[in-house]
Amino acid sequence: MEARRHIFFSGRVQGVGFRYRATYLAQSRKLTGWVKNLWDDRVEMEVQGEETSIERFLQDLQGQQFISIDNMEMTEIPCVKESKFRVVY
């Protein structure tokens, strides 16, 4: 079943390649959405796709070298039409 999640990540998530790794992992799982750095050292993301793909994506992201996720604030939001996962500046 398709789902969309809005997520705030905190921890060591900026300056460690988080956005680029998230983009690579999301594209490899055919997920759509976006990711961006926030001024308060957190990262914000919306990710959409099959629920099992989103769960595996988040597990893979937590297992990446240099990235240390201390907390994820996640909410389910309505799906939207989009065709790719991208970094937002």
Predicted regions and their residues:
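Intrinsically disordered, low-complexity, mixed-charge
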Residues: 1-89
